[in-house]
A protein has these predicted regions:
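Short, small/acidic-rich helices and loops at N termini and domain boundaries
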Residues: 1-13, 68-83, 88-93, 222-251
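Non-catalytic accessory segments of DNA primases and related replication-initiation nucleases
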Residues: 1-75, 117-122, 197
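Short phosphate-binding/catalytic loops that engage adenosine nucleotides
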Residues: 63, 204-205
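Phosphate-handling DNA/RNA-contact segment within nucleic-acid enzymes
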Residues: 77-178, 183, 191-193
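Short, surface-exposed amphipathic charged segments that create phosphate/polyanion-binding patches used
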Residues: 175-180, 217-230
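Conserved catalytic-core subdomain
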Residues: 183-185, 195, 236
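Short, aromatic/basic amphipathic alpha-helical patches
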Residues: 190-202
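A generic structural motif
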Residues: 205-215
Length: 252
């Protein structure tokens, strides 16, 4: 089809016919690049049987969106097929894969959550694109609305329009979003108190839980029977009010 169109154009320009020497046309076909949201070679947790340890773990934590997570029987082996990371495959084990995706759904990294109760390292974060922030849920939010920021991917599934930081060094300043920071309910943690204070100084809204709430994070609050969405919305503060609430809440 392209060749026929080319010949027709040359004919119109008088550049074809007997005695005419015309160079053969060159067509520059670029190899198409297709984005994918599929996690290669892994099974979504939603497709596992009810008794499977990975599915049982998430369901016991009341996480309903099982399609968002995958089961990986050999984490080191699978990771090395995505990006050479581990020098040895010894002591390989199963983990739940938590994909980190951009707004278009393309995976740029992932976390592996151990299924072993006494694992020394519960979460391992692997970045396939080091230019991206260690953030979970960018594909799940509406950036035109307030975006809640939680401390863990599982916590983000208990409130609407939420992302999660997958590391202590996450910088969200590159995003022009209206953030509401939802740190863990740990008033004796100097680190968390400092993070809440910094968010207030930068003009962000923060969530400061009432003293009646004893659970540490959103997942625990859901397991305890709290309406997490209402709890978060009714305890969101900013400015001077946030600073006063922080002073009342902290224990350090």
């Amino acid at each position: 089809m392209l060749h026929d169109q080319y010949v027709m154009e040359r004919y119109k320009e008088g550049l074809t016919g007997k005695g005419t020497q015309t160079a053969s046309p060159k067509f520059d076909f670029k190899t198409p690049v297709f984005k994918t949201s599929k996690v290669v070679d892994l099974t979504p947790v939603s497709e596992l049987n009810k008794e499977h340890p990975a599915r049982d773990y998430l369901e016991r934590r009341k996480i309903e969106d099982l399609d968002s997570f995958y089961y990986c029987p050999k984490f080191k082996d699978w990771t090395n097929r995505q990006k050479k990371t581990f020098d040895t495959l010894r002591q390989d084990s199963a983990r739940i894969i938590i994909p980190l995706r951009d707004k278009d759904g393309t995976m740029f990294g992932f976390q592996g959550r151990s299924l072993a109760p006494k694992a020394k390292i519960r979460y391992i974060t692997i970045m396939l694109d080091d230019s991206m922030p260690k953030v979970y849920g960018l594909d799940r939010i509406d950036p035109s609305k307030e975006v809640y920021v939680t401390e863990g991917p599982f916590d983000s599934h208990f409130i609407a329009n939420a992302i999660a930081m997958c590391g202590s060094d996450v910088n969200l300043s590159t995003f022009d979003y209206k953030f509401v920071y939802t740190y863990d309910n740990e008033p004796r943690s100097r680190e968390i108190v400092a993070k809440i204070k910094a968010a207030i100084v930068l003009g962000h809204k923060v969530v400061i839980f009432p003293k009646s709430i004893k659970e540490k994070d959103l997942n625990d609050m859901a397991l305890a029977g709290h309406d997490v969405q209402s709890l978060v919305e009714s305890n969101t503060y900013s400015g001077l009010e946030a600073q006063l609430k922080l002073n009342e809440w902290k224990r350090v």
